[in-house]
């Protein structure tokens, strides 16, 4: 299940993405590198997609969410030693 919500401007889009109890993945469609970079940094999700679907992951990168999603340590790779860090996986399609 996926949802698409149209926002009036970038600030509203970021607010909508973060205004949830869950944080497995978030995405934004934009032609602005400025907004893509800001969304990647300020989205409160474990995985961030820009101009890509939010479903599906590469299995060789750390996988996990924030907030009420995917509670606990991230899966895959050497993430076990980085247990106390915050990692965000980002994708941008030009």
Residue ranges and their predicted role:
Residues 1-94:
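Conserved C-terminal structural/oligomerization subdomain of aldehyde/semialdehyde dehydrogenase
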């Amino acid at each position: 299940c996926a949802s698409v919500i149209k926002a009036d401007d970038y600030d509203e889009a970021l607010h909508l993405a973060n205004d949830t109890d869950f944080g497995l993945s978030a995405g934004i469609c934009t032609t602005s590198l400025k907004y893509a970079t800001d969304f990647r940094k300020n989205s409160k999700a474990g995985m961030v997609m820009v101009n890509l679907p939010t479903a599906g992951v590469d299995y060789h990168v750390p996988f996990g969410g924030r907030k009420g999603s995917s509670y606990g340590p991230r899966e895959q790779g050497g993430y076990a030693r980085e247990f106390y860090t915050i990692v965000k996986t980002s994708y941008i399609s030009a």
